[in-house]
């Protein structure tokens, strides 16, 4: 996430005295979307919220972005993270503002224990009304599970990630429902 501090000024009487945090946040948002993708793995960028401004006739002195970048591997995630820092350094200079970046979370490569794959499939074959689909070798999303699984493996345990399919209309939507009618 980013907190951007500018300099307020009266938009009509002395706009030259202001350093517009809102415009800096807008510029950063557009540049984040333009980070070049990486041939070593999939990448994602999301600016989810922007809050800025104090009034219609005031050069905005404060802006806050809630955002994230993701990379398929830790190396690609680092590539994305480095771009974020470079973008905000440039925005700070161009708009004469001060950005403070805060890591609010992260994702990591989803490591699994291949020794569990056959065991999990054997158990799933005995679950009524379940159809096994081909294995997904590089599942995406579920950053919380990726972090949990990594910690289990680091402590000598084994873990596997299971996707339980359902007929829904997309994640993170207001009408999200896994349509589980039997549990």
What is the role of each PLM region?
Residues 1-111:
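Midchain, well-structured core segments that form catalytic/ion-binding scaffolds
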Residues 104-183:
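An extended, acidic, His-containing surface patch that forms the Zn2+-binding/catalytic region
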């Amino acid at each position: 996430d980013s907190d951007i501090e500018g300099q307020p000024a009266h938009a009509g009487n002395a706009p030259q005295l202001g350093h517009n945090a809102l415009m800096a946040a807008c510029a950063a948002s557009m540049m984040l979307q333009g980070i070049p993708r990486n041939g070593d793995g999939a990448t994602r960028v999301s600016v989810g919220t922007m809050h800025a401004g104090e009034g219609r006739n005031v050069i905005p002195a404060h802006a806050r972005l809630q955002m994230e970048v993701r990379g398929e591997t830790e190396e690609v995630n680092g590539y994305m993270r480095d771009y974020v820092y470079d973008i905000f350094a440039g925005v700070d200079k161009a708009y004469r503002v001060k950005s403070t970046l805060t890591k609010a979370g992260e994702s990591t490569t989803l490591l699994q224990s291949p020794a569990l794959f056959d065991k999990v499939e054997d158990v799933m074959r005995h679950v009524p009304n379940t159809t096994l689909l081909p294995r997904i070798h590089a599942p995406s999303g579920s950053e919380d599970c990726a972090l949990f699984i990594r910690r289990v493996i680091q402590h000598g345990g084994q873990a596997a990630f299971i996707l339980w399919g359902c007929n829904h209309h997309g994640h993170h939507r207001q009408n999200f429902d896994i349509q589980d009618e039997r549990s």
